[in-house]
């Protein structure tokens, strides 16, 4: 197909998103309100807050531009179909979920393609509420540190055992519980792109 535009928005959030002017693909990719929380060298990541059932929730909107030629050529050289950052991230999040690895929740995403070439996209993810793994580790006792490293190793071992060669750094983990029995109870994996 010459020109293709994909858009997915969770039904439960459509009304709240439309109330701040986010209805169509273009609205998401040109959204400029909210604080920029990404480094200049990374794709734009902005925060936005919505009131859902009387509670204020924070979301991160990751916007991507046109895919660089060298990335597409590298994919073709490796006999892969060129894939945008948005499509890659949605695919990885789905893969993690399919293997019962707790991961951040995307609530909206979209991509625009011309002759199969990514011309931009976005992904909107819900904030994971908890404490950053690195901060928890720093303030933990020696016994807790050992346990945290053990379950971090358990997470990495699970990923590798299932053939998932994705980098998960300690900075990419949020501790959502103080139950350090297993990574599934304690950690949620996020994609950290902010400075």
Task: Please describe what each predicted stretch is.
Residues 1-36:
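Juxta-kinase regulatory segment immediately upstream of eukaryotic protein kinase catalytic domains
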Residues 23-132, 161:
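Conserved ATP-binding subdomain of kinase catalytic cores across diverse folds
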Residues 76-81, 113, 138-143, 193-195:
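Short helix/strand-bridging catalytic loops that position acidic/His residues to coordinate divalent metals
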Residues 82, 114-117, 146, 173, ...:
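Short, surface-exposed, charged/polar-biased interaction segments
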Residues 85-86, 118-121, 150, 177, ...:
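Short alpha-helical interface elements
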Residues 87, 92-95, 99-102, 136-172, ...:
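Conserved kinase catalytic-core helix
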Residues 167-195:
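Catalytic activation segment of kinase domains across protein kinase-like and atypical kinase folds
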């Amino acid at each position: 197909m010459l020109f293709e535009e994909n858009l997915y928005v969770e039904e439960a959030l459509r009304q709240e998103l439309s109330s701040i002017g986010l209805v169509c693909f273009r609205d998401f990719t040109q959204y400029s309100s909210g604080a920029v929380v990404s480094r200049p060298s990374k794709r734009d990541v902005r925060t936005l807050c919505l009131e859902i059932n009387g509670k204020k929730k924070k979301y991160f909107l990751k916007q991507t531009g046109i895919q660089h030629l060298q990335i597409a050529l590298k994919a073709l050289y490796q006999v892969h179909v060129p894939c945008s950052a948005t499509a890659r991230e949605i695919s990885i999040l789905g893969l993690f979920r399919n293997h019962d690895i707790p991961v951040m929740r995307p609530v909206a995403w979209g991509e625009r393609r011309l002759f199969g070439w990514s011309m931009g996209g976005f992904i909107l993810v819900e904030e994971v509420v908890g404490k950053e793994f690195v901060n928890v580790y720093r303030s933990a006792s020696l016994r807790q540190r050992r346990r945290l490293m053990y379950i971090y190793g358990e997470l990495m071992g699970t990923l590798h055992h299932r053939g998932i060669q994705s980098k998960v750094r300690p900075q990419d983990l949020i501790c959502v519980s103080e139950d350090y029995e297993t990574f599934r109870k304690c950690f949620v994996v996020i994609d950290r792109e902010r400075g």
